[in-house]
Amino acid sequence: MRVFATGVLTTVLSLPAIAAERPTDTSLYWGDTHLHTSNSFDVYLFGTPGSTPDTAFHFAKGEPVVSPTTGVRWQLKAPLDFLVVSDHAEMIGSIPRLFKGDPVIADTVTGRALLKISPDQTVEQLQQVYDQIVLIGSGLEDEADIDLSAKQLIQDIHAGEKRRTTWDETIEAAERHNDPGNFTALIGWEWSAQPKGGNLHRVVFMPEGADVASQFLPYSALESTDPEDLWRWLEETSEKTGADFVAIPHNPNISIGLFFPTETLSGDPIDAEYAKRRARWEPAVEVTQIKGDSEAHPLLSPTDEFAEYETYPFVLTPDGRTPDPTEGDYVRSGLKRGLAIQAEVGTNPYKVGMIGSTDSHTGMSAVEEDNFAGKGQHDTYPEQGSHPTGLGSSKGWDMGAAGYAGVWATENTREAIVAAFKRKEVYATTGPRISVRFFGGYGFEKADAGSADIAAAGYRKGVPMGGDLAVGEGAPSFLVAAMKDPVEGNLDRVQIIKGWLDKDGKTHEKVYEVTWSGDRKPGTDGKLPPIGNTVDLRTGRYTNDIGEEALMGVWQDPDFDPAQPAFYYARVLQIPTPRHSLLDAIALGVDVEDTGRPATIQERAYTSPIWYTPES
């Protein structure tokens, strides 16, 4: 364990009053809020008809299952604590019913049109069905090969009670597997809007059970692709049923600039009402998952040497677009935009915590690099790594083995897990179960980093990740503690990323090194030398001869200006370890360069930010 403190530390001051009461007796729970089964149209069309919610829950609980994609036994190394089966609300369950010959679906204009282009249900034919549905559902009907309107598709295989049976089965599965105190099965779905091809997807879940969930059908992008309509529906349905919804956006990296916008989808300036609605319903963002990492991009954060991580530019439309990144596509840029918008309208619409989840379409939350089940049927086997996935122009090896959500909750129940999301006391990892505590305040000392109970000091003197710093005396200080995943690589370093808004309304960012392994010293540019790399490229094995099992530190902002709004979050980096594509390349006997991906990666964790807002 290494304990480190940087910055000029202040003497202990009385902590200013914190705005909201927060629990202090929290434990770490691991989960996945984004998992698909064959009730999702794309899972079925990608050739995985045997994936069920029951399979997903059994797998998440650590039980061995027969893989729906390979037919072999698959099992997590350690169980998860919670799971959301979040099948696409659009046509939920309808595609399996179509190909099983259910006349309610098959004997319609849409059903007949889709069956006509897939008479034998070959891989190519099912991909064609998928492409047509995506184009029509995205408002790109003119580019489709079949003469079918979105209105007709909705009427035939989505509208009315056509989804009721599958939704009820989804609810029943969650009720069967929910075991308060041991395993939490949350009821949820995915709203899968992609107007003009830009990803605006949200996963929605709630702490309530069947008595509430059975009162509605999940809102989908076939009702509206505008997130403002989703928020209105959440508000209205919450008032009618008592559902305490949470909506989690994901994959801003493929949103073509629409995710953290400066104007609404309809082209109006963002106003206070928009900002308040978004902030109310969306407390966190899924920053890392199989379809890439959305924390930062090297073109947007050119001075950040670790911004180049699992970049994934492949928009989901069949045309194969890979647009350049914009500030609307990445979370760090979005956090900065939020500060600027708050200065204009009084509310920060992008005041979000960060989590990871899988977006697995295999029915299994399997994202360990050496136990990766792939995104779906098209990239499950090593030899499929160079093959198209059916998702835009991506190939199997473009998929990253990520991620999970770490949640600091009072207990493992639906209510406590959702409460932690709402107060943003959650964080993201790219897969390894790195334990991270992060607190901000005005009285942390070096001794706090060496305390036997860091959490007690953190809660007593400050606010945890997701919190707001009240205005205090002097510059704020931050207490961070990270411990490695017991079966993964050691830790390289802990950094704090700061973003702020200056007096001229311009935003800035900076990466600070806080604590690190070994005797390295930062250079004149503030950057640390690389830690090294123990990965054997012939075998895919590595050793923990470098790095530390735990890193703790206290850091005080040396550039603090009390007049500038700011956010701070911690990023924890592992030592280099083999990427799943390296292991595939070794197994296949091909050059790792043929995968188009790096041989090794530095897995990481991102905490939710802590915000500072001047009184004025």
Where are these regions (language model features)?
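Substrate-binding cleft of extracellular glycoside hydrolase catalytic domains
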Residues: 100-142
